[in-house]
Amino acid sequence: MPQLAPEGQLATQQIGDIRTEAGALIPDVTIAYHRWGEYEENADGSTNVVLIEHALTGDSNAADWWCDLVGPGKAIDTDLYCVICTNVLGGCNGSTGPSSQHPDGGFWGSRFPATDIRDQVKAEKQFLDAIGITRVKAVLGGSMGGARTLEWAAMFPDVVDAAAVLAVSARASAWQIGIQSAQIMAIENDHHWHEGNYYESGCNPSKGLGAARRIAHLTYRGELEIDERFGTQPQKGENPLGPYRRPDQRFAVESYLDHQADKLVKRFDAGSYVTLTDALNRHDIGRGRGGLNKALESITIPVMVAGVDTDILYPYHQQEHLSRNLGNLLAMAKIVSPVGHDAFLTESRQMDRILRNFFSLISPDEDNPSTYIEFFI
C-alpha cells in the first residue's frame, strides 16, 4: 500500500535528485502535497487515484482553491477517488524551489536551474514512485496545470489512464511568451531583486512582483467583464482626472489591480514566479517529438479538452487545435463565460458538469451519472 499523508493535511516527500531536460542537476528534491479519499487498487493494477495539477500561483490544497469541485459527492468525489495534488517543482509552498535551502545551507536563489513543464512532470512521477503509486486513474488541470496534464499524457501513458486538459495550448505562443516575459522583466527590474539572490537581504522585490501580477491578472479576465465592472469610474474618494497625475488618485480598475497585486505579494515568492513563468515560456509538446501535431497524434490515452470562449491568454482556438490533433480525443467542452481564462476556476456549475461528464466517460460503470456532453470539434 502507498504511504500517504493524513487526509487534507500538507505533507512532504523526498524524491531524490532531478536531472532537468537542459542538463542541470537539482539534488534531494522535496515535493509537497495534499491527499483526500482512500486509496483503492484493483486486481488489474488500476487504481482510483486522481491527480490534480494546479495553475501558476496555485498550491497543493485543491480542496481550497477548487472547493466547489473537490470533496465528498462533488465532481471530483473524494468518496470515490483518492485525490492527490502536489505543489509544483520550483514552487514556494513546500516543494523545492528558489526560496528553498541549498545543500550548502544558503538559499537556492539564482542558482536554482531553469526548468520546463516536462521537468515538473518528471518530479511528480518520481513523487508517485516514492509513495508507492504506479497507476493513476486520471490527471487533470488548467492553465499551467493543463500543460502538465498534457505532458503526463505524452510522457507516461503507461501510468495515466485518462486526462482532462483545461484552458491551455499545445505550446507557448509568441503572444504568451511576450506577456509572460514582460512579467519576468517587471520583477527583475525591481532594485530588490539582486539577480534573484534577495532572500537574505530582508527586502523582497514586492513592487516588481505586484507589477507582474497586474499584467497577468488582466490576461486572466475578460475584457468585457472588466469594462462592465469598472468602466471609467474613479475609485471611491479619489480623482484620477485632476490637473496633475497622482498615484494615489486612481481609477476603480487600478484599485482592483492593486488589490490583486497585494494579495499575491503576501502569499507568493518572486523567485518562484520567475521560475514557473519561464517554464511556461518553454512549454512545447512537440519539441523533440516531430512537431506539435505529430506529438499530439501519438498520445494514446483518452483526453478530454475544455476551453473558455472569452479566454485571451489561451484563446479557444488553441483548444480546438488540441481536439483536432489528439490521437485519442475523449470529448471537447466549451466554458461560456464573460470571465475569461479564470473561468475554469470560477464557473463552478459549468466545471461541475464538465468534470462529471469526464468521469462518467472514463468510468461508465461507476455511480457517477453524466448529464450531457457537448462536442465542439
Curated annotation (Swiss-Prot):
Alphabetical GO biological process terms: homoserine metabolic process; methionine biosynthetic process
GO MF term list: homoserine O-acetyltransferase activity
Record flagged with keyword Acetylation: no
NCBIfam families assigned to the protein according to its UniProt record, in alphabetical order: homoserO_Ac_trn (TIGR01392), PRK00175.1 (NF001209)
Alphabetical list of InterPro entries matching this protein: AB_hydrolase_1, AB_hydrolase_fold, HAT_MetX-like
Name of the molecule in the record: Homoserine O-acetyltransferase
Keyword vocabulary terms for this entry: Acyltransferase, Amino-acid biosynthesis, Cytoplasm, Methionine biosynthesis, Transferase
Binding site for substrate: R213, D342
Organism domain of life: Bacteria
Purpose: Transfers an acetyl group from acetyl-CoA to L-homoserine, forming acetyl-L-homoserine.
The enzyme's E.C. designation: 2.3.1.31
